[in-house]
Amino acid sequence: MYFSILQLPFLIYPVFGNFDFTGYTMVSKIAGAALLLAIMSNFALADCFDRAGSYYSIDPDYLRAISWQESRFNNAAINGKSAGGTTDYCMMQINSRTLADLRREYPSLNKDKLYSSPCLCIHVGAMLLRRNFNKYGLSWLAVGMYNAGMSNKQTSIQNRYNYAMLINDHYKKIKAGIIQRPHIE
């Protein structure tokens, strides 16, 4: 069965709602539901950086910038050459000493879980950055402490500053599209 273009508005009315011939716009419950679904799916489509950023009130591109600096978004990354003989795990390079401290609060948290769940790794990194912000304020000092720790030695102070400036540079490149945002579930 074929329909002319003039018959189309009458055919879609029962399904989609009212059709306004003057503005050629359609008002319907289905269109509203589709809009709501599209808005809701943005959160469902959000990757782990977006969800962790939202949960910890941190711009997710800062989390991406840290992950880029620490591992180039590689969740299998490991660094066994950290200061004090510690090891850093997963894409957010969670330090083994920090992980041991976190196990007091989260006994089941371990390096295997960080490696098997990139999203968990991102959330742990976001939590650590949020704790730095809560303790030291929303500052580059807090960002620098993510990597260089809290020591007040001159080299640590310089390392914190250098790290923070690297993160800021990566952040700008992510915003500009020079560093591509990965979609990590």
PLM regions: where:
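Sec-dependent signal peptide recognition
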Residues: 4, 27-36
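Cationic, low-complexity basic patches in intrinsically disordered or flexible, solvent-exposed regions
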Residues: 8
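Catalytic glycan-binding domains that act on GlcNAc-containing polysaccharides
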Residues: 45-185
